[in-house]
Curated annotation (Swiss-Prot):
Pfam families: GATase_6, SIS
Active site residues per record: C2 (for gatase activity)
PANTHER family, A to Z: GLUCOSAMINE--FRUCTOSE-6-PHOSPHATE AMINOTRANSFERASE, ISOMERIZING, GLUTAMINE--FRUCTOSE-6-PHOSPHATE TRANSAMINASE (ISOMERIZING)
Pathway the protein takes part in: Nucleotide-sugar biosynthesis; UDP-N-acetyl-alpha-D-glucosamine biosynthesis; alpha-D-glucosamine 6-phosphate from D-fructose 6-phosphate: step 1/1
Function as written in the Swiss-Prot or TrEMBL entry: Involved in amino sugar synthesis (formation of chitin, supplies the amino sugars of asparagine-linked oligosaccharides of glycoproteins).
Segments forming domain SIS: 375-514, 547-686
Name the record gives this protein: Probable glutamine--fructose-6-phosphate aminotransferase [isomerizing]
InterPro entries: GATase_2_dom, GFAT_N, GlmS/AgaS_SIS, GlmS/FrlB_SIS, Ntn_hydrolases_N, SIS_dom, SIS_dom_sf
Catalytic activity: D-fructose 6-phosphate + L-glutamine = D-glucosamine 6-phosphate + L-glutamate
Keywords: Aminotransferase, Glutamine amidotransferase, Repeat, Transferase
Keyword Repeat set for record: yes
GO CC entries: cytosol
């Protein structure tokens, strides 16, 4: 939800037009995260305020506004900081006044872009209004800009990092922030807590080291030659504020030279920095990135990037590694496809192979998951395996639950992260939790992860995004390696999660002789899964015809499955809801008689999953019950069915029962896609939805 993009050039000459185009291009790469408005800010001409553009709607409107303005785009800058943002409304309706950047005052002395939600913004606003601050928007973000100005006005000589520390100490909630100020030209500060923020580094010269030292504050007390500090702001310790704007004594900052970004002569060289919510807008310019940790404060000044900590405690490592992204720009482009969704559906044969690459030896029928090896014995001795996820990721967990129970003989629980957080259930130290998330930044899953860690359980991450919060905070994990997924509705990430979890079940049962034959059967099935997915994709034309002829005018749908295919029914219903805006319900076939049959008549659109597995007799019984009440379901099956004239049958290839859901979900992906296209919906960015759900 929301997207931040910032661009800083130092000793690299760029004109204002180039900078604005870079911002717009970055925001377009972040569109998939979900948003309803956008904005950006660049420096004005000498002596002028910042130039800001804000528009409600898609980024192309912002781009048109910039093109139509009379701003001098040829003005050149040798040192410049620009910030931009796509907003998902949480406080205040989508409107230009509520768009980011938010400003501190009419002269924009401080401007801020922000992802997340500040939970104490009402208290902050009340105190700042009592100090004469006049608010112009409904956003929580404006509090940050006004608090920065308040501290600046009441603290003579404060440097940007010290000011930022004083601001960030007062904030509660989840956030990623970029702050720019006319009082600190050519500088920008950034921080994160519970919301992702990445720094890209582009330099023609080789970096001296591949890390940045974390600069911890020196304790103010007891340092020789330093006066005992006093509270900088009377309001900080005012009892009337009930502890809000706390009276923490400021730490003295220790500023060292940033080793990575200086030349042999000890001075910074030409360099560019890119701040972003994820890697997609950065890889066009550089693959060298650094992932900020919670409560890091990144400060760019005179070409140097410094990372400070808000407090001495916490923070883990004393360095932040500059990593190389294994991602190509082509992976985030649509190519010759009309939409990202159909591109990602068609990429599934390759994405599934990437998930298995280097992990499965099909000749010897061995599965190796190096990320779990150190914890293998602990996992095997677990009291319970508890999967925690949201949305599509939750469905992938439901899909593999029977297989884990069958192969590991360990009790398995699947939890919705939001419900888990609300209940705060008992957690035992010998439990193993498996957190599944495409982005690795899902807010509810992160809260559940924190609760799990506090209770001493082992946490495993299964994510698609390398360097994400879940991948860093869990003890170990498995990357699904599906590649960037831009469409809000998940397709290839779902099937890659499915396969990654199947690999985990196979890996955890490697020592079970009694299950050897079953394991070999599944591994042989995995060897053919890419080809069978490709074969299933050949059904595209038939599924398109079914969507147009039978479902285009329907506003509801029942999807019925059983066993391994209950998860397929849930995921299929979610796809139909997300993309075609048709109310759909995934139903467990065994629950038909407990209420759902009341909805069945000859006008109710129904899709039934009838795979040729051990549950087929029961699934067929459900079909007969539906047919007896006038229902005429579309059937998805891998079995040759006779005497069903007049029924639409989508026949998919047959594979091992526990893998059949990978093939059976593809017709739903295509069905929802064509319904959305024919109805004229925005396929890649459905209304009201976001790719990365980073707030509760």
């Amino acid at each position: 939800m929301c997207g931040i993009f910032g661009y800083i050039n130092y000793l690299v000459e760029r004109d204002r037009g180039y900078i604005l185009k870079t911002l717009v291009k970055g925001l377009k790469r972040l569109e998939y995260r979900g948003y309803d408005s956008s904005g950006c800010a660049v420096d004005g001409d000498e002596g002028e305020d910042f130039i800001m553009f804000k528009e409600v709607g898609n980024v192309s409107k912002l781009e048109a506004s910039i093109k139509g303005s009379n701003v001098n785009k040829s003005t050149k800058f040798i040192n410049h900081c620009a910030i931009s943002h796509t907003r998902w409304a949480t406080h205040g309706i989508p409107s230009p006044i509520n768009c980011h950047p938010q400003r501190s005052d009419p002269h924009s002395e401080f401007i801020v872009v922000h992802n997340g939600i500040l939970t104490n913004y009402r208290e902050l606003r009340t105190v700042l209004e009592s100090r004469g601050m006049v608010f112009e928007s409904e956003t929580d973000t404006e509090c940050v800009a006004k608090l920065a100005k308040f501290i600046y006005d009441t603290t003579p000589g404060v440097d940007f990092t010290s000011l930022a520390k004083l601001v960030f100490r007062e904030l509660e909630g989840a956030y990623a922030l970029l702050i720019k100020s006319s009082h600190y030209p050519g500088e920008v500060v950034a921080t994160r807590r519970g919301s992702p923020l990445i720094v890209g580094v582009k330099s023609e010269q080789k970096l001296k080291v591949d890390f940045v030292d974390v600069e911890f504050p020196e304790p103010a007390e007891g340092l020789p030659g330093t006066p005992k500090p006093t509270s900088l702001h009377p309001v900080f310790s005012n009892p009337a504020t009930n502890g809000m704007l706390r009276g923490d004594k400021p730490d003295l900052l220790h500023r060292a030279q940033s080793r990575a970004f200086v030349s042999g002569e000890g001075v910074p060289g030409p360099i560019e920095y890119f701040f972003a919510s994820d890697a997609t807008p950065i890889i066009e310019y550089t693959k060298r990135v650094m992932f900020l940790e919670d409560d890091d404060i990144a400060h760019v000044r005179d070409g140097e990037l410094h990372v400070h900590r808000l407090r001495r405690e916490g923070g883990g490592s004393t360095t932040r590694t500059i990593e190389t992204l294994e991602m190509e720009i082509a992976s985030v482009m649509k190519g010759n496809y009309d939409h990202y969704m159909i591109k990602e559906i068609c990429e599934q044969p390759d994405s599934l192979l990437n998930t298995m690459r280097g992990r499965v030896n099909f000749v010897n029928r061995l599965v190796t998951l190096g990320g779990l090896e150190s914890y293998y014995d602990i996992i095997r001795k677990s009291r319970r395996l508890i999967f925690v996820a949201c949305g599509t990721s939750y469905h992938s967990c439901v899909a593999v639950r029977p297989l884990f129970e069958e192969l590991t003989n360990i009790p398995v629980v699947v939890e919705l992260a939001s419900d888990f957080v609300d209940r705060c259930p008992s957690v035992f130290r010998d439990d193993t939790f498996i957190f599944v998330s495409q982005s690795g930044e899902t807010a509810d899953s992160l809260l559940a992860l924190q609760y799990t860690l506090e209770n001493g359980a082992l946490a495993i991450g299964v994510v698609n995004c390398v360097g994400s919060s879940i991948s860093r905070k869990t003890h170990c994990g498995v990357h699904i390696n599906a590649g960037p997924e831009i469409c809000v509705a998940s397709t290839k990430a779902y099937t890659s999660q499915y396969v990654a979890l199947v690999l985990m079940a196979l890996y955890l049962s490697r020592d079970s002789v009694s299950r050897l034959e079953r394991r070999n059967e599944i591994i042989d099935g995995l060897a053919e899964i890419g080809e069978k997915v490709q074969e299933t994709l050949h059904l595209n034309a038939a599924i398109k015809q079914t969507a147009i002829e039978q479902l285009i005018n329907k506003d509801k749908m029942l999807i019925i499955g059983r066993g391994y295919h209950y998860a397929t029914a849930l995921e299929g219903a979610l796809k139909v809801k997300e993309i075609s805006y048709t109310h759909a319900e995934g139903v467990l076939a065994g629950e038909l008689k407990h209420g759902v049959l009341a909805l069945v008549d000859n006008d109710m659109p129904i899709v039934m999953l009838l795979p040729d597995d051990y549950n087929f007799p029961k699934a067929w019984n459900a079909f007969e019950q539906v047919r007896a009440r006038g229902g005429k379901p579309i059937i998805i099956t891998d079995k040759k069915l006779d005497n069903l004239e007049g029924f639409t049958i989508i026949k998919v290839p047959k594979t091992v029962d526990c893998l059949q859901g990978i093939l059976n979900v593809i017709p739903f992906q295509l069905l929802s896609y064509w319904l959305a296209v024919k109805r004229g919906h925005n396929v890649d960015q459905p209304r009201n939805l976001a790719k990365s759900v980073t707030v509760e």
